[in-house]
């Protein structure tokens, strides 16, 4: 059984309004026992923070090296976490560590929850899948519509 804990990660100072909307929707729709907002350097102010600061069960947790202990990886994830620069790559490693050690449901800060996860929590595990999207670099090409046609049209 999966713990009724939602985990969000934010690496950076300004927590956005959209992140606040994501966490607020998860809280109101799913009603988890706890919500972890694991962060690095996040300021507890601004529009996003104002939306979540009063949520019952919200735990604002700074990233710690101890999150990476006990992964049976000889410290590789922790070393990579401190070596990598891209926030998305660092968040991937942190997500792996948190779910492995503590369990729960990880959600990105751009996910709007519209239905509770109660049935999914009864499973040993689950994963969400997003539809295939066009790469961002495509729209920087000389004629993006040509690529759009090739990728999307039958």
Language-model-detected regions and their locations in the chain:
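Short amphipathic alpha-helical segment that frequently serves as the phosphate-/nucleotide-binding helix
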Residues: 16-24
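Short, acidic, metal-binding catalytic loop of nucleotide-sugar glycosyltransferases
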Residues: 23-33
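Charged, glycine/proline-rich intrinsically disordered loops and linkers
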Residues: 73-74, 78, 142-154
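Acidic-and-aromatic substrate-binding clefts and catalytic sites of carbohydrate-active enzymes
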Residues: 14-17, 41-45
């Amino acid at each position: 059984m999966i713990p009724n804990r939602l985990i969000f990660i934010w690496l950076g100072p300004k927590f956005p309004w959209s992140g606040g909307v994501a966490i607020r929707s998860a809280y109101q729709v799913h009603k988890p026992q706890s919500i972890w907002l694991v962060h690095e350097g996040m300021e507890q102010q601004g529009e996003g923070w104002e939306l979540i600061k009063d949520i019952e069960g919200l735990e604002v947790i700074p990233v710690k090296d101890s999150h990476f202990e006990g992964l049976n990886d000889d410290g590789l994830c922790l070393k990579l976490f401190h070596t990598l620069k891209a926030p998305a790559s660092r968040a991937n490693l942190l997500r792996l560590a948190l779910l492995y050690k503590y369990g729960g449901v990880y959600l990105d800060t751009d996910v709007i929850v519209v239905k509770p996860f109660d049935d999914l929590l009864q499973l040993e595990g689950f994963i969400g899948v997003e539809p295939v999207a066009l790469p961002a670099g495509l729209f920087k090409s000389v004629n993006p519509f040509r690529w759009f046609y090739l990728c999307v049209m039958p």
